[in-house]
Amino acid sequence: MGEEIQQTHFEQADYDRFQQRLEAETEHLRGLFAQHAFDNDSRMLGYELELCLADDAGNPACNNTEVIAATGNPLFTSELAKFNLEINGNPFPFEGDVFARVATDLYDLFDQAEKAADRCGARVAMFGVFPSVGPEHLEPEGFMTELHRYDQLNNQLLSMRGQPIQLHLEDVFTLEV
């Protein structure tokens, strides 16, 4: 998940403040672990599932924010690509019929996703790698979810790398971008 940001331009002082906050929060978390502040007696099981959105031809449907809004459920969130969304399932105590409860929850949430996608002209699919994604679907313009946090993440990764990212995926087919 993550939170949307409003700011789109950052100075060195912003990066310095971010680093300081990250270090302070990490230290705070270490302290909580050292104090055994977390309830270790009740184990919980949580899950998430990433989904792909396809059009009637099986190509990526780039309307994740529309589908998420149509669910009306905060357990659905966006992913980097406009043709992906994520279910963040409910947590359950790790006891008894926990797997049956997770399955029921997942079926219910998946059904919500299917109905919302259908209302938005898309279909929901579960793929590890979307089989019809090609190089044309990997350009930020047009296929990256239009949230500032994704745009800034992309900009920072490219800036840190100092050169374009090259992908070479080889399996039954080869994709080179």
Annotated model-derived regions:
Residues M1-V177:
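Phosphate/nucleotide-binding catalytic core
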